[in-house]
Amino acid sequence: MTFKVGLVGCGRISDIYIENCARFEGVEIVACASLDLDESRAKAAQHSIPRACLVDDIISDAAIDCVLNLTIPAAHADIALRAVQAGKHVYSEKPLVTDVEDGRRLLDAARQAGVLVGNAPDTFLGGRWQTVRRLIDEGVIGHPTGVGAYVGTHGTERHNPNPDFYYQPGGGPLLDLGPYYLTAMVFCLGPIARVASMASRAFDQRMIENGPRNGQWMQVEVDTHSLSLIEFESGVIGSMMISFDVWDSETPRLEIYGEEGTICIADPDPVHGANIFGGEVLYRTRDTSRWTHQPRPVGRDSWQVAQCHHGYNVNSRGLGLLDLALAVKEGRQPRASGELAYHVFEVMDAIAVSPAAARCQDVMISCARPDPLPVSFPDYLT
């Protein structure tokens, strides 16, 4: 039976979702809606979606199984709550909500309605992060002991013609990029117990440097540089730097340290790393390490490259929606679940609160560590 999806939000990101869903077996986008009906009609015509309509039409249509919620972050909670109250499953773009209480209300309503909530990011379901998880589960680096994530850009004003919301409440690098890294960490290392952080903003205003608004100034209302310490329930400790105030960097995007080795995600591009589904996974072990010897060993300049056995190594946005559709059929929770997204959001909320509180913040909402995808999971995008 086809899992029928109604799309709400027809912005730029919707294209890759629509294109991928058209290739997923058993999933069909049957209607699309936005605040602007003309925009909905244009999107439907562009992708041959059967119906363009209003948001209320999708919420009330009994033939639609799931709402794909690609609205702006401030609207995520409202659209998702309306969907579950109408008896529909929902899959939303990140973040799940912009307020902790909204997240609790949404998940409670979903449980009462007997429907599932899924949420981006789903990049951790891609081949790269499944490979990282395999290395950990197979004991290649031994018991994990630490993790470091480093992502710094200089914001979005050079390539996005309307970047204002990135610098308004609900935006900023923590909520924009943090979900990718924190979700990958939780997938690999389990839920987070507490955090401590410092934050700053380098500029009170930023200039838009592209498009029809080139040269216009916008106010910066959120912190744009965050440095966090993270303690996991397992005892692993880590750090995360995430910033819109960095012009360039050579730091790896993420490293996981274990008793017997290191896993490295070495991408120089700050919008790669945990933001993408594929890519190299490098590792070293006790036997191939460089810096534990004097004099330094010869012939160990290159890292070992892990073999990837999993699919989805291209831009696979919507993979979490496919897994949600299968979860409905199989009677289980989706891997990119609302509970996972809620935990990650509470972690980010604690990180945001910590600088003013000047102390560690406990994370009150835990979650299950998502299961890896089986190697046999069908790859519809290659």
Regions found by a protein language model. Give the residues of each.
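Short acidic low-complexity segments
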Residues: 50-60
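Beta-strand-loop-alpha-helix segment that lines the small-molecule cofactor/substrate pocket
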Residues: 66, 72-73, 77-124, 139
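Predominantly a Rossmann-like dinucleotide-binding segment in NAD(P)-dependent oxidoreductases
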Residues: 123-219, 358
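N-terminal Rossmann-like dinucleotide-binding module
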Residues: 1-47
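Short glycine-/small-residue-rich Rossmann-like dinucleotide-binding loops
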Residues: 63, 71-72, 242
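Core-facing hydrophobic residues within beta-strands of well-ordered domains
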Residues: 27-29, 64, 144, 192
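C-terminal glycine/acidic-rich active-site capping loop/insertion
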Residues: 204, 208-214, 218-221, 227, ...
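Glycine-rich phosphate/pyrophosphate-binding beta-alpha loops
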Residues: 241-249
